[in-house]
Structure formats: structure tokens, C-alpha cells
């Protein structure tokens, strides 16, 4: 889905305005089936937890989890070769702008929480759901599941401790935790059952 160029209101608490360039951001988080295609094509070794996830056919259309930051980066590199275009993780500002839209919404669909539009604690699912399960929870630009279901790695630089950042909250987070502005530090080498990722495809004139 296109993230249009412009100035976006961002931030949790103290808001700021960021000017962003145009990119294509994934409509959904990357599904398990896509990562299985990647590992089958490349022969890349994976952790035991991720291996079990990839073998679970009933979750092929769920967002992949149990992926480290390096797993996500390697998938992007493979996808770039397959597509012949630059592919990477969304930067934090891009991710938040795609979720909040030009309106600067609290949740992707608006400023009033609705557990029927996402997968979080209040929704009652207790596990991941298919990536296309909540079209009614889409952001104004069309990206879906940017609130809940799984946290998503973003491509911001590591902090002083080497930790990376995840965005969006998961099925284990409450309404407050799945706000568009929500971000958490995460150990890049520790995959979890609540973390996946989403890709960005750059236009030819983006850096």
C-alpha cells in the first residue's frame, strides 16, 4: 500500500511532525507461507520454534512469528532479489505514519477503540489470526493489522544496548498497547511467539 509523501504527526505523548518520502508498505504482516517459501528456496537454517511454525499448515495464512531481527532482514534481502526492487523493513516513522494516516489517529481506524477491528486481549482470540482477518481495522491508506495480532520488527538503528524496536502490539496486549504510537525495545536475537514483521518496497527515487 502506498505511504504518500508528506508531513505526519507522530509520537507517544510528546508529538512531533515528520516529513516522509513515498514508499510501498505491506498491506499485511508477512505470512508464515511466505517465509516457508523463502526458507525452501534458500535452504536457510531456522530455529526449532520457527521450524515448527513453518510446518503448521493451519497457520500458513497467519503472520509468521518466532523470527529474529536477522531472519526478517534476510527475508527482505531475498525478496529484493526476487522482485528486482529494494525491499527492507519499514522504519519506525514510516510504520507509524502508515498506521495513523494523515489524520494522526490513535488506532488505525480512528480514535475510538473497537476490539472487533483487531486482535488483542479485549478481542478474546488468545492467539494469532489470519493476516486478512480484520479489513475493517485498516488504516486510512489501506494497511491492515497494524494494531495487535503480532508485534512487528522495524528497521530503526539499534539502541546503545544493541536492542531493536517493535511496533503495533500483539494478541497479548490490551487496547493501550496496540495504539499506533506504541513502540517497545526488543532483543534482536530473541524470537518470540508474538513478533513478526512487515516489508517496505522503495520507489526508484527513495533512499
Predicted segment positions?
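Functional-site microenvironments in short loops/helix caps that host divalent-cation chemistry
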Residues: 3, 52-193
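Surface-exposed helix-capping loop/turn segments at secondary-structure junctions
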Residues: 41-45, 78-88, 205-207
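Short, acidic Gly/Pro/Ser/Thr-rich loop/turn segments
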Residues: 10, 173, 206
